[in-house]
Amino acid sequence: MASQVSLTAQGSGLSAPLNGPEHLTSTTVENDPRLLDILSRFNREKIPERAVHARGAGAYGEFEVTHDVSDICDIDMLLGIGKKTPCAVRFSTTALERGSAESVRDVKGMAIKLFTGDGEWDWVCLNIPMFFIRDPSKFPDLVHAQRPDPATNLANPAAWWEFVCNNHESLHMAVFLFTDFGTMFDYRSMSGYVSHAYKWVMPDGTWKYVHWFLASDQGPNFEQGNQTREAAPNDSESATRDLYQSLERGECPSWTVKVQVIDPEDAPRLAFNILDVSKHWNLGNYPPDIPVIPERCVGKLTLKKGPENYFEEIEKLAFSPSHLVHGVEPSEDPMLQARLFAYPDAQEHRLGPQFSDMAAKRTGHAANDAPKTKKPAVPLQKQSREHAEWVSQVTSSSWSQPNETDYKFPRELWAALPRLRGEEFQNRLVVNMAESVSQIPEDLRQKVYKTLALVAEDLASRVESLTEEMVVPEQRPRL
């Protein structure tokens, strides 16, 4: 009987008859359990990509305490100058898919997993110190507005601008995003902000509201961002390549970790609500009439090496704002409260129910995964009635409605740009906005101009003038 040799995926031969009715119901696959195993593993080797922050790059490093902060925290990792903690960091784009270009105008993510003696502590940061919304129920609409058109799968700036025009709290971050910070870009030069207020709790139950951030010691690198955008059609991986090549050269990027602190009794007296993540904690840049919340240095985070297997070591990491350690509590910020549920739920969908046990084992930090001794939780000291009434704002019907600070913060940002970065920096904001708005229908363009006028008349007029010059003839209204 004539026969041929079939090869499995591993190159092993298997004789298979070419003819004979008795063999019609018996296949090579059925006779080779190893091939069944190979194919089944291949079918399952990919996992669902993240709903946001799908495209990423990562590295390993360590955090070192450089300043004494024992007067404001009881966090073991931060107590003791010179104390070092290993960490894994994942950088990412935000809105687009895993295969998208890194150079697109987009918010960037910086997630840090610290392997402390008390367990994993995650810092889930963005490179912009505020967020688009304060009402978590709007989050799915926000993400959908940044996705490709569901009919054509093409970029859809109209959906994005429609969202901004209908949700004015997003104007602050929108103005920031259309500066060169939106494309300033390599991962080493961007800073990271946790954005939300957290609580640092002392042993006696007293506590402070805090916001911490990582200031890049390399950046910002606007020139690199402009070069990256120009090269985007030919190089969609420039930021990842820059990170890994710098580590191979022994150039270890670092970030200075700083914290801002507010007493809970002082929070209601500020001119904005620190539980509103669409606003930033003023460092002295803007607005000029809102109190400065000083920064304090905490430590230094330094990256040392890249992963040996990105998929296993970085892509399968599960970050969440709910991964906290003793001495840290979440604030009442509604967006943060929603993320405490949404992140673990998304990770379970992506990685399976055992995702929380994987990170330390994969990254080689299993020894630090479980606390050796667990400190008892400390009851938080109760605050005044004034503070309680202030906190109740986040559950009021007016919380998701526009208020004057939604226009004040972007207005002050727009006005401060020439002072902070120069007039040309402000001019490029106008150009960047016009390039985007020129791609949307005329009726929506008019809506955008009216919305921008709520921020600043000169911003609106300058964007309108340049946009209408850019509009292609087919988009102009016919007479």
Swiss-Prot record:
Polar residues compositional bias, start-end: 1-13
One GO CC annotation: peroxisome
Cofactor section: heme
Active-site residues per Swiss-Prot or TrEMBL entry: 53
Record has Metal-binding as a keyword: yes
Top-level taxonomic group: Eukaryota
Binding-site positions, heme: 343
EC class (word): oxidoreductase
E.C. number: 1.11.-.-
InterPro entries: Catalase (IPR018028), Catalase_AS (IPR024708), Catalase_clade1/3 (IPR024711), Catalase_core (IPR011614), Catalase_haem_BS (IPR002226), Catalase_sf (IPR020835)
One Pfam family this sequence matches: Catalase
Pathway the protein takes part in: Alkaloid biosynthesis; ergot alkaloid biosynthesis
Example GO biological process: hydrogen peroxide catabolic process
Keywords, alphabetical: Alkaloid metabolism, Heme, Hydrogen peroxide, Iron, Metal-binding, Oxidoreductase, Peroxidase
Record keyword Iron present: yes
Molecular function in Gene Ontology: catalase activity; heme binding; metal ion binding
Region annotated Disordered, chain positions: 1-28, 365-385
PANTHER family tied to this protein: CATALASE
Function: Catalase; part of the gene cluster that mediates the biosynthesis of fungal ergot alkaloid. DmaW catalyzes the first step of ergot alkaloid biosynthesis by condensing dimethylallyl diphosphate (DMAP) and tryptophan to form 4-dimethylallyl-L-tryptophan. The second step is catalyzed by the methyltransferase easF that methylates 4-dimethylallyl-L-tryptophan in the presence of S-adenosyl-L-methionine, resulting in the formation of 4-dimethylallyl-L-abrine.
Family: Belongs to the catalase family.
Name of protein: Catalase easC
Organism: Claviceps fusiformis
